[in-house]
Amino acid sequence: MAAGPRNSVLLAFALLCLPWPQEVGTFPAMPLSSLFANAVLRAQHLHQLAADTYKEFERAYIPEGQRYSIQNAQAAFCFSETIPAPTGKDEAQQRSDVELLRFSLLLIQSWLGPVQFLSRVFTNSLVFGTSDRVYEKLKDLEEGIQALMRELEDGSPRGGQILKQTYDKFDTNLRSDDALLKNYGLLSCFKKDLHKAETYLRVMKCRRFVESSCAF
């Protein structure tokens, strides 16, 4: 392996292991670039985990002939579709960093309850062999986004919560067709919401710190 890619992998692993600053002023401030790098890496990891789990669940439980029709029916299922959040990179670029951070936080917080039931659904899953840690990973990303908000907010009052609903918990009765469809829909929303959060964070990072990886 060439030195460049190997060093990049080692740097990414090191950043994932870094803790977030707990209180502003308690410890030397982490550079804003590092806060963004940490948040983006965590969001990418969670989005990939969600995408892999969705595909694995689909292969295991959803007949191939039914997938397209079910996916179309899921289009209006996600609670996050009811908030005025950007739907893609171009729309995200029209919003301020503080707005994007608030939307990211709302998306992450809406899953903190449901994912606590995820390990019961995927007890034998190859992807979710460590599924009991998904909640901790989401909490870690939540803390990172909150750290960025503390750095970027100018002291103006925060806007009210836009999304007060959370998602239903995952159903552990996998012998029920209704439960399978419910879990399939939830996993689809989980994947979509984490993709949005990752996109928002990458847009913010790229426009603040111009870099070659901004094309996505």
UniProtKB/Swiss-Prot annotation:
Disulfide bonds join 78-189, 206-214. It is found in: Secreted. GO terms for cellular component: extracellular space. Coiled coil: none annotated. InterPro entries: 4_helix_cytokine-like_core, Somatotropin, Somatotropin/Prolactin, Somatotropin_CS. One of its GO terms (molecular function) is growth factor activity. One of its GO terms (biological process) is response to nutrient levels. It holds the Pfam family Hormone_1. Keywords: Disulfide bond, Hormone, Metal-binding, Phosphoprotein, Secreted, Signal, Zinc. Zn(2+) binds at residues 45, 198. Residues 1-26 form the signal peptide. The modification Phosphoserine is found at residue 131. The keyword Metal-binding applies. Belongs to the somatotropin/prolactin family. PANTHER family: SOMATOTROPIN, SOMATOTROPIN,PROLACTIN. Plays an important role in growth control. Its major role in stimulating body growth is to stimulate the liver and other tissues to secrete IGF1. It stimulates both the differentiation and proliferation of myoblasts. It also stimulates amino acid uptake and protein synthesis in muscle and other tissues. This is Somatotropin. It comes from Felis catus (Cat).
